[in-house]
Amino acid sequence: QAANMNTDRFGAYKKSAEILVHQILEETWQPKEESHLLVLHASNHRTSNTLAIWQKVKERLDDRIRIQEINLRNGTLVDCSGCPYKMCLHFGEQGKCFYGGAMVENIYPAVKWADAILLLCPNYNDALSANMTAFINRLTALFRTTRFYDKALFGIIVSGYSGSDLLAGQLVTALNMNKTFYLPGNFCMMETANNAGAAMKLPGIEDRIKEFSEKMTHILIKET
């Protein structure tokens, strides 16, 4: 931060506090007449409860929301290995990352295009999946030169037994607090379903899907 702001650590602290207070007092988020939504997942369509819920949410979203879906399982998404700061900044200034691949060719352009991102996160071990973690880590190179204040964060999390709140917290700390994505209230839909196909049989699931879809539309699309 200090290097980015051309100051020392204390100067960066004061400047960051000033930016934070300004953002709190003057919320800048504005819905649009047409919005772009990037959906990221690393799941199997045939067995995924998380994807099953997303398909129903998708059906209820306003037609003015343009959707792009990327499956992080398609090809190998190499995780960040912690390049030196100046090297990461150098590649970030070119909209690239040292490790290249799908992250640079497909995902960076999609993130730039998006007004919001929706992460589909099945919970197996109270942690985001390896591919999802790699996406967040590799986003750092782009973040060196691009802030994401004007992009909203949403999530759908399905746990076999418990722990959805832990993954929601990871999304908040990694993408809102660290990467500056805009965080709407109740940004995440959390469900508990163990066996394949169980999510869509949960009591009240259709009502919760409707509520979440309407919330996303309200955040992204300007009322006419």
Identify the residue ranges that each predicted region occupies.
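Short, glycine-/small-residue-rich phosphate/pyrophosphate-handling segment
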Residues: Q1-L20, F148-M189
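A short small-residue
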Residues: A2-A3, A116, M189-A196
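N-terminal beta1-alpha1-beta2 submodule of the flavodoxin-like/Rossmannoid cofactor-binding fold
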Residues: G11, K15-T145, G197-T224
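Short, intrinsically disordered/low-complexity patches at protein termini
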Residues: N131, N137, F143, D150-A152, ...
